[in-house]
């Protein structure tokens, strides 16, 4: 799963980065087996992402604040445990993300190099 993240407009980019890195990320990995997480990557946009010359040359839309990549196995917890943790997870995401502006992609990984 890959998510293109935009921060809650009530937060500064630094507040978003801090919460995602220091609160949400560690919280998500406390019980990785519940969701079946086996690999979790956070890509934090640079603070000057909105002035990136390549993005300007391509007439790109406003920069995302980050990208999340999660690779999963089948969850090992009960459906009830997964649902309960998912509800907690969503509450935290509502705090720091602009959820409607943060698209999520699910797909098949095809390694080209590496």
Predicted regions and their residues:
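Macromolecular interaction modules
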Residues: 1-114
């Amino acid at each position: 799963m890959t998510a293109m993240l935009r921060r809650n407009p009530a937060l500064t980019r630094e507040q978003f980065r801090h919460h995602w890195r220091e609160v949400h990320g560690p919280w998500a990995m406390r019980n990785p087996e519940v969701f079946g997480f086996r690999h979790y990557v956070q890509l934090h946009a640079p603070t000057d992402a909105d002035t990136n010359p390549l993005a300007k040359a391509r007439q790109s839309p406003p920069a995302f604040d980050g990208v999340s990549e999660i690779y999963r196995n089948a969850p090992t917890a009960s459906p009830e445990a997964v649902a309960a943790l998912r509800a907690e997870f969503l509450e935290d995401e509502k705090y720091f993300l602009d959820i409607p502006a943060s698209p999520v992609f699910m797909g098949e990984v095809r390694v080209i190099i590496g």
